[in-house]
């Protein structure tokens, strides 16, 4: 435990920020899982709408520094591929 007053304050601030970021990351993962459930159910309309939500949250997380920009782009690319496979016409 810190003894200096400013260090005590920083510890409280760090804990608040950690909890906030954990909540945001959890929300992000939930939106991605919702998309993957829609893909598993082969529901193209639901998959498209949940993909928009997931992409928006990924972009927001990347802009806020919650995740790296390249990580967000990689995840978006993988989600788009899943949607393209689902919505491709069966030959």
From Swiss-Prot:
Q: Which GO terms describe its cellular component?
A: cytosol; small ribosomal subunit
**Could you tell me the Gene Ontology terms of the biological process aspect for this record?**
translation
Q: Which SUPFAM superfamilies match?
A: Ribosomal protein S20
Q: Which InterPro entries match?
A: Ribosomal_bS20, Ribosomal_bS20_sf
User: Locations of Basic residues compositional bias?
Assistant: 7-23
Specify where the region named Disordered lies, as residue ranges: 1-28
UniProt keywords (A-Z) are:
Ribonucleoprotein, Ribosomal protein, RNA-binding, rRNA-binding
State one molecular function term (GO). Answer: small ribosomal subunit rRNA binding
Function, as annotated, reads: Binds directly to 16S ribosomal RNA.
HAMAP family xref list: Ribosomal_bS20
NCBIfam families, A to Z: S20
| Family the UniProt entry places it in | Belongs to the bacterial ribosomal protein bS20 family.
According to UniProt, the name of this protein is Small ribosomal subunit protein bS20
Annotated source species? Brevibacillus brevis (strain 47 / JCM 6285 / NBRC 100599)
